[in-house]
């Protein structure tokens, strides 16, 4: 999906906030001009995650990384691992896929690519009130029918922390669909707080299903940047589940037709999908 005007404005605003505390005004102006050039050249023909990757490369020329994502990722991986058994018990009590989907959407709140920081109280509130989240029961039924007939599922993860919920969901799918071969795909390199192979290993996902990197350090799944292995997995998967905004922005209208699972975290998505802030978005592309 090509970045629209509001995405472009959001990207620019994030970059200005990112460098605001730097004291060298001339350096800041030069950097912002470089950002504007990238937005002008690529903002009308590429998705937001790809544009942000180009900006990230320019940022490295001017500044050292100002966020220790390794520490943040470890913190939220451990934060969610501590809640794993409680969440698993709640899912098993409800004994349905719908509850799993609500949890993985709630966990999508853990997104440093969009927010400057995570409100732990808000995150806990989303997890505590997961039964109050609304998703389409009809869409759940569609997914269940497809999984019952499919032999292969590709599950594309998004952020750290929430990958623990992805693991629980995948295990529930394994229990329900015994003949379903599931592969998980993570980012191929560091991209904000997105989950990589290191995160998959830390939270135990690699002990549950085969996990592959997508070949790119981008906050999404950009077809042209994927490894041949990742392209092959996408092409051959009978069902694809794609988590998060970055995957939606990079996969929509790219002939992959996944089920999108994410949390509404911005006004554009609120208006586009007709949902309230911090409510789940769950749908298959062909029915959007």
Placement of each model-derived feature along the sequence:
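Electropositive, gly/pro-rich neighborhoods at or near active sites that engage anionic ligands
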Residues: 2-150
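A general structural motif
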Residues: 150-152, 179, 237
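Short glycine-rich or small-residue beta-strand-to-loop segments that form or flank ligand, phosphate
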Residues: 152-158, 183-185
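Gly/Ser/Thr-rich loops at beta-strand to alpha-helix junctions
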Residues: 158-167, 189-191, 245-249
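Histidine-anchored nucleotide/phosphate-binding helix
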Residues: 160-178, 182-183
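Short connector loops at secondary-structure junctions
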Residues: 182-199
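C-terminal functional extensions of proteins
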Residues: 186-187, 200-288
């Amino acid at each position: 999906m090509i970045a629209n005007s509001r995405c472009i404005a959001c990207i620019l605003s994030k970059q200005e906030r990112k460098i605001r505390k730097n004291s060298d005004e001339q350096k800041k102006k030069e950097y912002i001009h470089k950002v504007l050039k990238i937005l002008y050249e690529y903002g009308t023909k590429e998705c937001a995650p790809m544009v942000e990757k180009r900006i990230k490369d320019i940022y490295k020329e001017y500044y050292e990384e100002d966020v220790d994502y390794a520490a943040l990722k470890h913190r939220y991986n451990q934060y969610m691992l501590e809640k794993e058994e409680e969440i698993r018990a709640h899912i098993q009590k409800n004994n349905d896929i719908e509850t799993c989907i609500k949890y993985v959407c709630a966990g999508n709140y853990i997104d440093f690519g969009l927010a400057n920081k995570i409100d732990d109280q808000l995150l806990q509130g989303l997890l505590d009130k997961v039964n109050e989240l609304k998703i389409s029961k009809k869409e759940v039924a569609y997914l269940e029918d497809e999984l019952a007939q499919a032999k292969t599922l590709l599950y594309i993860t998004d952020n750290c922390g929430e990958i623990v919920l992805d693991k629980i969901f995948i295990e529930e799918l394994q229990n329900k669909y015994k003949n379903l071969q599931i592969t998980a795909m993570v980012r191929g390199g560091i991209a904000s707080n997105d989950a990589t192979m290191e995160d998959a290993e830390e939270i135990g996902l690699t002990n549950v299903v085969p996990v592959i990197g997508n070949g790119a350090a981008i906050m999404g799944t950009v077809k042209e940047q994927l490894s041949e292995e990742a392209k092959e997995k996408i092409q051959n998967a009978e069902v694809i589940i794609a988590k998060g905004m970055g995957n939606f922005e990079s996969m929509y209208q790219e002939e992959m037709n996944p089920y999108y699972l994410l949390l509404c975290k911005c006004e554009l998505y609120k208006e586009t999908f007709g949902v309230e802030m911090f409510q789940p978005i769950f749908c298959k592309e062909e029915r959007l």
